Amino acid sequence: MKRPDADSRTPPGTRGRVLLTGATGFLGAHLLCALLEEPRLEVACLVRGRDRDGARARLDERLARLSPPVRPDMSRVQVLCGDLQDERLGLSAAAYDDTCGSIDAIYHCAGLVDWAAPYDRLERVNVGPLPALLRLARRGRRKRFHLVSSASVCYLTPGSARITEDAHDALKLDLLRLPYARSKWAAERLVLEACGAGLAAQIHRPSIIVGDSRSGQSNSSDIVTRMLAACVGMRLAPEVDLVLDYCPVDFVARAIAALSRDRHDGLRTFHLLNPAPARWSELVLWLNLYGYDIRLVPHARWLERLGQEVRAPRHPLRPLRRFFFERRDEVDGLTLFETYEEGRSSVPDDRASAHRLAELGLACPALDAPLIERCVGAMISGGRLPAPGIARARQLPVNGFDRLAFEPLLRSALGDASLRVGAVAPVAHASRDGLTSSLAAWKYGAGIGVHKYAMSVARRGRRTRRLRVIVKVKPLEHELRGAIVTAARVCSERLALAFATTPEVPGFSGSAQRELAVYALADARFARHAPRFYGTLPQRDSRPALVLEDLGDAALLGGRRGIDVWPSGHVAAAVRGIAQVHAVWYGREAELEREPWLGVSHTLRGMLGARELWRELAEFARPAFGAWAGVELAPLGESLVGALEAWWPEIESQPRTLIHNDFNPRNFAFRDTPAGPRLCAFDWELATLGLPQRDLAELLCFVLGPRRAGERAGRYLEMHRKALERASGRRIERGAWRAGFGLALRDLLLTRLPMYALMHRFRRQEFLPRVLATWQALYQWQAAE
């Protein structure tokens, strides 16, 4: 897709009049409002009706139902009573000629979205009007043509390619299985042919369009609404691997309106997808956290149950039976629904479109919990979903803290009673909330999560400066446990029961207060390798709200590069830095165990108390571990649980210290210093008493990769030992240190990696297969040594 030049935009207010079809539809009504945001632009809407008054009434009624309410300048809207199936669009000769001579562009938004209708019905509505509209576009003055198509034309089955915006020849009709997609393909072909004859046009391919990002108001008959209603009613959802790149309707409308002002010759195509998609299983989890009771079950079991229930005349999925049940020989007996699972079809590539939208300052709202909550809330208000059984707490607004909250805190932290805080503003950011905190936030609200703020700070004798901080609102322990139990129950009743009945889970119990205490440690070695801690803000419910230095995204190597194989200099900086932190409590185990904030640590007693939980986690993770790292790894977790009494005392016989216990690239950054990168570790809520090698083992699994992992690990293991010796002033025997690394690998496999497998069921952990393979390579290297 060629990018327009800087001066190739139509200046606002210079277009006179455009024609819009489909203005009474879900997207069309929003597109009308978006077009009217352009000053002085007039919009002629072609609307079906008995007469002009009837057509006008239909449009007025549709606009009146928009939420949030809008008040478009209707003096710039002309309603044309017409018919798209007529070769002259149902207009009189005079009205047709006037339209030909007065409009600058045509926006064809009308159409039928139906995932189960036969092609002949869809062709009549989605393809039939194109010849008449294209004749109108070519007649009289030069006009631009804008076709609202669908991203579904890019889903070719079988296929695995990413279809770029300009790859029209790659779209093969015989590989499009969905009749709706075939009808959109046919419409696009007509536009493509017209462009070959000199027409300037744009094709807009949105993904599935969901509710308004502000109100959640959605299309009552779309497939998403029907699917959610069915799963809530059945209390079952299919375990399928669907990527949900849905876009809110208001974003799609604004994007089309903005992109359509680009001036160009020929054809431009845009893919409108959500850059922050969710997965189907994550949506099901969110519904459970919202208060519904839905279990993920194998697709075949769900389909069998649906076959029984869909006989009811008013079942929400009854109109879509063909989509879910009809098996197609040409795709190995899959249903149309199954062809949309990840990996079975090609997918649209939106990188060029996303770049252009970013240049225009347009960002698609993430398909996150707040957006889903608004959409579900609107469905409940509209009677399309029942209210959930459990009421949720209302989230505090992100701007819930102001100058009066920050000023006394910063005065105390910086030791300056004269300090003044100016205007405080929340800062939008991509959330880095931990998975468990995200779950608690979804279930309980209460502002749980990471929020960023910017403020001006004036100090006597110094220049006023801008300060950016992070406010980390912590979930309470019962909230964290409740969220994890809910997630487990979606997948396995036995796993949920194990979480619910384990009185204290080592590492999780007391996590909120523990992180606060760790940040407050008065030790220069820790402070050098952690963000600055300013203190806590008071909360009405005694919920900790930690205020920390904002490191900025530039420092997050993991965020820039992804969690992948790293350069040796950064790995070494992480190893030496965490050794400094390990030195703080190294050799002081008894003293550390007396600290009230430590909670239940990883002792043999605590591990045995949670044995049933470890067993259920190992069993749950076994299929995934076997698929990713081989059958020999799959049963190892369960055997480690059975032999806890034999090998865990070996851990307790070695020197231990305070460890991060979640030490991977998602939880640390690097500061740039003249001496090179310096570690800055955050998110200390899982900190516990353990082997220092445990943090090293997790780090290496994430950053080495399986190839030559053992060879490289030996160097970093020795580097860690020597750094800890220097920092603690204690001699560490090399053989015992090496043996402790093997024990740490076992600990990692037992207590942490299965939790990632659980989260992977809902939010894809792309790193996990590689981490498992690296773990296995390290374990084999350690055993061979």
Give each language-model segment a name.
Residues M1-C109, Y119, V471:
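N-terminal Rossmann/SDR dinucleotide-binding element
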Residues M1-K2, R17, R40, A44-V47, ...:
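Amphipathic terminal alpha-helices
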Residues G101, A105-C109, A116-R124, G128-P179, ...:
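Conserved Rossmann-fold NAD(P)-dependent oxidoreductase catalytic core, especially the SDR/UDP-sugar
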Residues L173-R205:
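Active-site Tyr-X1-5-Lys
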Residues L259-G333:
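Mid/C-terminal beta-alpha module of Rossmann-like enzyme folds, strongest
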Residues V450, S456, G461-L608, P692-Q693:
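Conserved ATP-binding subdomain of kinase catalytic cores across diverse folds
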Residues A555-H660, R671-P674, R770, Q780-W781:
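ATP-dependent phospho-/nucleotidyl transfer catalytic cores
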Residues L686-S728, D747-E766:
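Active-site activation/catalytic loop segments of kinase-like enzymes and analogous catalytic loops
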